[in-house]
Amino acid sequence: MKFSLPKIATAPFCPPEVAGSVAVDPTATFFKRVLRFAGPGLLVSIGYMDPGNWATAIEAGSRFGYSLLFVVLLASLAGMVVQCLCSRLGIATGRDLAQLSRERYSTPTARLQWLLAEISIIATDLAEVLGCALAFHLLLGCSLTFGIALTAFDTLLVLALQNRGFRRLEAIMLVLVATIGVCFFVELLLIKPYWPDVALGFKPSLAAIGDAAPLYLAIGILGATVMPHNLYLHTSIVQTRMIGKDLASKRDAVKLARIDTIGSLALALLVNAAILILAAAAFHQSGHTDVVDIQDAYHLLDPLVGGALASVLFGVALLASGQSSTFTGTIAGQVIMEGYLNLRIPCWQRRLITRGLALIPAFIGVWLLGDGAIGKLLVLSQVVLSLQLPFALYPLIRMTNDRQLMGPFVNRWPTRVLAWGLFVLISGANSWLILQWAV
């Protein structure tokens, strides 16, 4: 049979083709409805544990032990609030954030938002490239340059999933996320952290961030938690569930989406906390307080734990983390392009363009700076995402506060105060981080 590339975008990556494709029986039991609605939150949670977050968590654990675990907890709670706003917007309006931005803002403003959103997609993909390339380098012993080149072939994975259905994609994501979780669970069993100290780390403490260094890392954790592309992604993929148009059905959908979001981000919280706990138990407790790179963490695990299994699991988790973002990045890119420009191209072309643009800084960085470029480029990707986040978060809050748009699903005043408070906090934290990186 002759092979040919698809001429049009195909499910499960194209928002119009998967909208309402997953049936949710309103007469089913509550537990069955929860299971049918589960999935969009899982895809969103992948952005909360991508390779861009690893370096910050590793440095925080190795330098300050368990003391910044409460920051991971608070940042995850903030993410839950923001993502619940996203799911509510998508269900209440039947449109995603990009579509609504195109409709409600002037053409120049909408085009600027589109450009910034596309830059954030490329920055996110850069972190995925670096994470996967580093995993190939650590697990296979190949050069970083060759590892970066290997990541170009993930476009074939996008092609392999054409016409497979959205639930198939969610199942694959579940396997990858479960792989990450199992790897870190086994890691913690091998390292045996002192759990009473771990529990104390979740207790909020101003003293723990009283100095400039821990405050810097705390802001880094907060600033890297909410990913701008996730806001567009979530408002779109929550519409994959087939629900009634009546008010009662939408209220039930909002409740089910909230459960899906909180449960999925709780899983991401456990993974991010596990990374910090791993670094604290393996490195800080043994006096290695200067571990700030993923490569250093990988190479130190074997001698400290006393076996090769720990480092192998670490590498496998890193690969699963980077690879899972391939799919969510493709969907988010389609949402942004279709929403802002009303333009649809084949998904494999979309993936190829984004990955090609992400490979350029990765190759140049490794060529000029060597292996040390990985950490610097990961930081760069987080800076770019921090710059873009307010431009996605602001319209989200404005729209969910708009009674004419949201109807009975409009934010109540406590939610408004909380949302604007998070906007000021996250934007201020990101601005402070950018100033620190600039100097």
Tell me what each language-model feature is.
Residues 108-110, 145-148, 311, 315, ...:
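Loop-to-transmembrane helix boundary motifs in multi-pass membrane proteins
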Residues 172, 348-356, 377-426, 430:
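C-terminal membrane-solvent junction of multi-pass transporters and transport-like membrane proteins
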Residues 80-92, 238-248, 266-296:
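Extracellular/periplasmic helix-exit of transmembrane alpha-helices
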Residues 17-22, 56-61, 84-109, 134, ...:
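Flexible loop linkers connecting adjacent transmembrane helices
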Residues 44, 71-104, 113-119, 324:
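Juxtamembrane transmembrane-helix boundary signature
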Residues 155, 177-206, 215-236, 396-404, ...:
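Hydrophobic alpha-helical segments and their helix-loop junctions in multi-pass secondary transporters
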